[in-house]
């Protein structure tokens, strides 16, 4: 019986990691569908990997930036709404994800 309990607990972190990886893949797929352009998707994929590793709960310790896109004062908890808001922000401020990524490379933020 003890061996069975140890097996269950030893597998728990792997189950959590798999579901998190699946979630991240779903967030990326959703973003790709929103953008359609493969080059622009690749830029936002790199940008948000740098910013949050696609974690919808990511918090910036130096500012109020939060979520996948690391938007200042973001209150939205839903990852898909975070993505929508992040893409809207990029379009308003930088026009394209590739321009946002270039800005990030030069300044360390976008």
Language-model regions, residue ranges each:
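Core subunits and conserved enzymes of cellular information-processing
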Residues: 1-19
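Alpha-helix capping and helix-coil boundary motifs
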Residues: 4, 23-26, 37, 78, ...
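Catalytic and binding regions of secreted/periplasmic enzymes and modules that target cell-wall glycans
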Residues: 46, 60-110
């Amino acid at each position: 019986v003890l061996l069975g309990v140890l097996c269950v607990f030893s597998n728990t972190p792997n189950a959590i990691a798999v579901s998190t990886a699946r979630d991240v893949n779903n967030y990326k797929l959703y973003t790709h569908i929103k953008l359609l352009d493969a080059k622009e998707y690749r830029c936002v994929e790199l940008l948000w990997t740098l910013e949050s590793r696609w974690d919808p709960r990511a918090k910036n310790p130096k500012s109020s930036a939060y979520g996948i896109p690391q938007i200042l004062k973001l209150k939205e908890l839903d990852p898909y709404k975070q993505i929508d808001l992040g893409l809207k922000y990029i379009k308003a401020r930088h026009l394209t994800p590739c321009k946002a990524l270039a800005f990030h490379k030069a300044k360390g933020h976008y």
